[in-house]
Each structure stands twice: as C-alpha cells, then as structure tokens.
Amino acid sequence: MNEQYSAMRSNVSMLGTLLGDTIKEALGEHILDRVETIRKLSKSSRAGNEASRQELLTTLQNLSNDELLPVARAFSQFLNLTNTAEQYHSISPHGEAASNPEALAQLFTRLKDKKLSDQDMRSAVDDLSIELVLTAHPTEITRRTLIHKLVEVNTCLSQLDHNDLADYERNKIMRRLRQLVAQSWHTDEIRKLRPSPVDEAKWGFAVVENSLWEGVPAFLREFNEQLENSLDYRLPVEAVPIRFTSWMGGDRDGNPNVTAEITRHVLLLSRWKATDLFLRDIQVLVSELSMSECTPELRELAGGEEVLEPYRQLMKNVRTQLTNTQAYLEARLKGERVLPPHDLLVSNDQLWEPLYACYQSLKACGMEIIANGQLLDTLRRVRCFGVPLVRIDVRQESTRHTDAIAELTRYLGLGDYESWSESDKQAFLVRELNSKRPLVPLKWEPSAETQEVLETCRVIAEAPQGSIAAYVISMAKVPSDVLAVHLLLKEAGCPFTLPVAPLFETLDDLNNADDVMTQLLGIDWYRGLIQGKQMVMIGYSDSAKDAGVMAASWAQYRAQDALIKTCEKAGITLTLFHGRGGSIGRGGAPAHAALLSQPPGSLKGGLRVTEQGEMIRFKFGLPEVTISSLALYAGAILEANLLPPPEPKKEWIEVMDLLSDASCDMYRSYVRENPEFVRYFRAATPELELGKLPLGSRPAKRRPDGGVESLRAIPWIFAWTQNRLMLPAWLGAGAGLQRAIDAGKQDVLATMCRDWPFFSTRIGMLEMVFAKADLWLAEYYDQRLVDKSLWPLGQQLRDQLAADIKVVLAIANDDHLMADLPWIAESIALRNVYTDPLNVLQAELLHRSRQQEHPDACVEQALMVTIAGVAAGMRNTG
C-alpha cells in the first residue's frame, strides 16, 4: 500500500486498539482474546492458509450463545470505525490525492489546452446545474445516534492531525476518542422501531443542518476562487448551481405510510427548519453589520435618515419576519388553526431582497470584503435552500392515477377509462385539460384510494410555489400516464405548472421511452404547457432487476441518447433524472467516470440524481466531504459538456446489442425461468430475515405474497450483497461479453474499453463488484443453509462468476482486479479481514435461527448486527 495511506492505516490501528480496550473493560479479557483470535485467523485465511480458514469456521460455529453478540458487535463496530477513518482520509491534508476529485483548476488548464475559449467555459459555468435528490431508501443501517458519534470521531482525527500539539492537548483528544468509542459500544446499533416517514424527513433535515448548510457556501467560495484564478470570472451572487430536493415525505410509491397528511406535515416541518437555520444566520449578521455608511436606496429601505445602523435595522426586520413565520408554522404543526401573519415568508424573494440590498450597498460603499463574508454565504443559502429548505418530489405509481380517473368516469356515466384505448384516453384527457369547467363533482364520495390521490394533488396545490419540485410517475408506460397527472393537478386547483416526470424503469419501458415522449411532444396543448422544458426519469435498479445489469445499462444509454436527440430536434431542454443507487460513487473515479459515461449532451440540461441511503452519509456527511463531492460533480459536468464523450461507432453499437441480448437471456434464464431459483435465493441469503430489520418506512415488497418480481430492487440487491455472491450486479454481463468474444469481437471490445467511457465504466464497475464478491463465502452459505438438492444451482452460479472474472480481466488486459484503482482495492482488502468473520457468523446464525421455531433473542440480535456489519464492510448495501 502506498505511503500516502500510512496515516489512514495508523488511524485505523489506533481506533481498533481503543475498541479493544473498551471491549476488555466491558466484557473481560477472554472476550477480547476470542475476538483477536478470530481476527488473526481471518487474516491468515485471507492470505491463503487453508488450515486457518477451517479453524476460523470451526471457531465461529462453536461460539456459545453468550459470545455471539459481543463477537458480532466487535467486528461490526470496527468496520464502522474503519469507514470513519477512511472518510477522514478523503479530506485530510495527508490523503486528499487519494480520493478527492481532480482539482477544478487542473480541469480548467486541461480545457484551455484543448483550445476551449474562456467564454465557452464561462457559459458552461453559468449553465451549471446540480440537483441532488435525497431519498430515504432503507440502506442507511447505522442509527442516527451512532452517526453523530462517528462524526465526532472524525472531528477528533482532524484535531490529532497537527504536528504542533502539546502533550496535554493530545491527551485531551485521546480521552474524548476513548469516550466516543465506549459510548458507541454501549449503544444498541440496531433500531428497535421502524422509522416513520416524518423520522426519515428529519434525518434529511439533519444532513442539511450538520453538513450541507456549511458545506455548500464553502464549496461555492472555493469554486469562485478557482474561477477567478483560472478564468478571471466571478460566480454571480444570484447563481444557483446547486439545489437539494428530497423524496422523504413525498415518495408514496408502494409506501402506504406516506399519505397526503404526511406530505403536508413534512412541507410545514421543512419550512420551520428553514426559519430556524436562517434565524441563526441573521442573528450573526445583526451582530456583524454595524456599519452606518450606506447608499441612499438602502437608507430609505431601512427607514430613513434617523436610522443610525441601517444594515442592522434591516437584519432585525428580517429576524422579526422569520420569528413570526416560525411561530405560525409551529402552531400549524401542532394542528392549531391560526391566521398567517401579514409578513409570512412564502417566497425566496422576500428573504433575498433585503439581504441583496445590503450586499449591493456594502460593495458600493467600498466594503466589499464585508459583503463577501457571512452575508454572501447567507445569500447563497437563500438561493440553494431558500424558504422551503429542501423541495419535495411527489412520486406515485401510474396505475393509481388510472384507477382514480376510471372510478370518476364510471361515476359520471362516461364508461370505464381503464378499458379505453390509449388514443381514446389521450383524446379525453386533452379535452378535459382544455375545458374551463371542473370534472370532479363536489358531492362525489370516491373510494379511500382515489380520495388519497386527489388529496395529495390538493396538498401540492396549496403548497407555496417552489416547495414541490416535481411529480414523478413510477412505472410510466404511455403518454396518458403523464396527461392524467396534469388533469388531476388541474382538478385540485393547482395554480402553477409543476414539472411532471415519467419514470421509465423496466427494459421494455426504457426501449419505448422515446416513442412515448415523441407522442407527448406532438400534442399542441402539452407543448404549450411545458414551455420548452421536460424532465424524464431513468430507473436504474428496477431495470437491472428486470433484465440484468448489462442489458439494463445499454437500454438506459439508448433511451437517454434517443430522448436527447428527440428533444433537441423539438427545441426542448431535457433534464434527465437518474434514479441511481449506492453503487455509483464509491470513491472519486467511479462517480466521475459514471457521469462521463453518459451519452453526449445528456448533462446539458443539468444533472438531477438521487442520493440514496448510506451514500448520503458517505458523500455529504461532513462539510469537508460535501465540498469534495460537489467539486467532483461540478468538474465532471463541466467536462462532459465542454469535452463530450465520442458518439459510439456503428460497430460498437452492434457489439453492445449482441452482448446485451445475450446477457439478458442468461440473466432471465436463471432469475425468471429456473423454477428452483426463488427457493435457492430465499435459502442462500438473509432475504426473509431482512424484513425484520427496522430500516425504512417502506415495506420491502410491493406485494407480500409475490416472488422476485414483487421484491423491491433494494432488498434484492441487499440480500445478495450479504452472502457475497453480489449476483444482481454481474449475472449475465460476463456471458454477454463471452458471446461477443466467441463472435470474434475481442479486439473491438478492447478498443471500446480504451476509447468509450460508457463501456470502460461498465467494465470498471464489474471489477469493483468482483473484488467484493467471494466464492468460498458464497459456497459456505450454501453448505450451511441450502438444501442439498439446490447445491448444483449454487455451484453453477459460482462457476459463472469465476468465468466472468476471467473474461473481464482479459478485456481490461489486467492481471488482477482493480489494477487502476489501487486505493479502492486496498480499502476492500483491509475490510475483508473484518467482514469475513461476520459473513461466516451470519451463515451460522441463520442456520441456528432457521432450526428454531422461536429463535433465541441473542441469536436474532446478533444476526441483525452481522447484517449491519456486512453492510458497513461492503460500503454499499442497495
């Protein structure tokens, strides 16, 4: 391992020692000895010692019930501490080259070398748009209380990272670290109760408060410095290159716990939190802006000549307005019926105008250094977060809208909307959208399901404009799916046009996406409504579950490419919204590469992407990490727009079509067509046990009685990650590549790997998955948990995995996996020593728990801890 990582290694070692001391103090030397024996056996086993491997298995199988939980917790907590040390390494002065994105300054130099003009680069900066959508997917296993402790551990590591510390200072920091490690050890790592949608929303607000509030203005300050140095250009104060939206409290797709009332509550809570955070900012400005010299315009705004401190007076006025707004929102949250104050804050302009007036006056009076301090940071927060704090997307499944309108047409005696042809549906919807009379009768009493859909639309209509970002339609298939939502919003009295984004997420729907949008854009009423802007969401996880990762990736690429060209031809600005999971963005290179691997022109309308579960913490959990992640995104988008990747050659497209079809066939031959597959999946993974983990507010299944197709994509991936077969992330891909090689295309594949970012990223992601997969552990799960009649199926899958690894290494022309990303390879290797015992123990615990009708509480608790620990070891769960 490179010398660069020695600081991280020593931090990991130090935290491990502190954890060991804590375990010894809490449970005695014998438990620590047992943990240490297991660790040494695991290390030796990883180095290839077969005797150590067998002894490791025997030791873990023979643990007494009293030892199960302490051993599981020891390895799980160590992995959490390792992740914390690694996260600190990414921002420490000793480690920034390891995982930070390429510096923006270097990017500008490279762009100039490519003969791009400063004006081109400035235009690209002006158009920069990054919208990150925080989602409460149940992949964040770690409890919030433990996250806070780990954040403080990070702070201690930062404090220790100074060579000039006096002994007493170092001792004080070490004492605090010991306390934090002990607090973590004595805290239950598994939640007792499933979080409600409101709890999830509060978790999202905590990310804003603890990290983004400071991190976003700090990034923009750094970004501005790079622009000044490289392009002699300043980021305009009013620029909004970054926005945050949330699905927490708005995503009702398959989650009956997210009701219209919940969305209304979360919208109020979000506005309340915004007033709380802005009040802190304004209080600082009241204290700082004591200057008296100002422009005549500002003096008049502040109340005339008799006001001695005009800036301070204006800030006090804003403070009063925020206080009144907060009191009103608080009363509403308590369910009280209150009249809004006359100065209620509902729009960003109300906050922006007095602050910006102060900014302009300070600059005009020669006090630019003051204007560009705390005041500028607050102005940028108004632009990024504003009065809503985070905007909310509402997401609902397409059939819920169809059912609602069908119930209405039956009531009105117009027939059954659901059974009409697509052209009849469109004609009816467009006619009603153009009509001035309401369609929904006042005295109609619909079913509870339809009432809920209508009430959600009313919540949107009542919300201040700008607090709802978009309405996303999952499982969108036809143009009428989009028109139906516009009609429901119209009937609710929505006074503004809300972006309605169809989400295409199965293989067939991705293939049809361009046809659907072409039809929609051909409707005059629709073209007039959208005012030249269209958002389309591309589903990643569901399409991969449907067709396998390689076929899904290619369908996503083709769909995006076709949509870009269709919208360009129609003069429409397209925003592609990427519904990705945690597998993008492990380390700088994959995230950077993933953005550059999209079709040319796909980022012209900006980047809109989901940030899911535990990835929010890894990428935005600390202000410094936020700066690094935003720099990575900004650099990748500028590069993709100014130096777009090449259009794929005709031969490359033909090869992708060939291997995509072959990979889909192979994937479905197992997942859909093998009658034993579901039984094997349920036995070989902790899929059924995962349902007991109180992770998120959303049920793990769309239908409780269904097979794989009814499983949500996240538990599907999560379960296979736990047993280290990682099946959804590779099955079919290697077989498709082999088919192309058999067709004589190996040289073409090598060229694609070298010259086409889309393809090289696919290969890179496969390598990372293969590095995390483990054949002997997957086999051990089979031996402990699976009926012997199903062993041949498990063996077939492992043989396929081994063959796929060889194929990918041959195409990448590498001797070993992750050769070009040694930092991530090293990180995985470091974790394996601690994750392997958790995997073995998990298989043992699953075996014990499945033998008993009512498993011992200690077995169940230890099992949940191993699931959390393996998730920490793998660094991406779903």
Curated annotation (Swiss-Prot):
**Which Gene Ontology cellular-component terms appear in the entry?**
cytosol
Q: Which UniProt keywords apply?
A: Carbon dioxide fixation, Lyase, Magnesium
Q: Could you say which cofactors this protein requires? A: Mg(2+)
Looking at the UniProt entry, the stretches that span the membrane are none
Q: Which reaction does it catalyse?
A: oxaloacetate + phosphate = phosphoenolpyruvate + hydrogencarbonate
Q: What class of enzyme is it?
A: lyase
The record's annotation in InterPro entries points to: PEP_COase (IPR021135), PEP_COase_bac/pln-type (IPR022805), PEP_COase_Lys_AS (IPR018129), PEPCASE_His_AS (IPR033129), Pyrv/PenolPyrv_kinase-like_dom (IPR015813)
Q: What is its EC number?
A: 4.1.1.31
Coiled-coil positions are: none
Question: Which cysteines bridge via disulfide bonds?
Answer: none
Residues at the active site:
H137, K545
A Pfam family of this chain: PEPcase
What is this protein's function? Answer: Forms oxaloacetate, a four-carbon dicarboxylic acid source for the tricarboxylic acid cycle.
- PANTHER family named in the record: PHOSPHOENOLPYRUVATE CARBOXYLASE
- The molecule here is called Phosphoenolpyruvate carboxylase
Q: Which organism was this protein described from?
A: Yersinia pestis
The major lineage groups are: Bacteria, Pseudomonadati, Pseudomonadota, Gammaproteobacteria, Enterobacterales
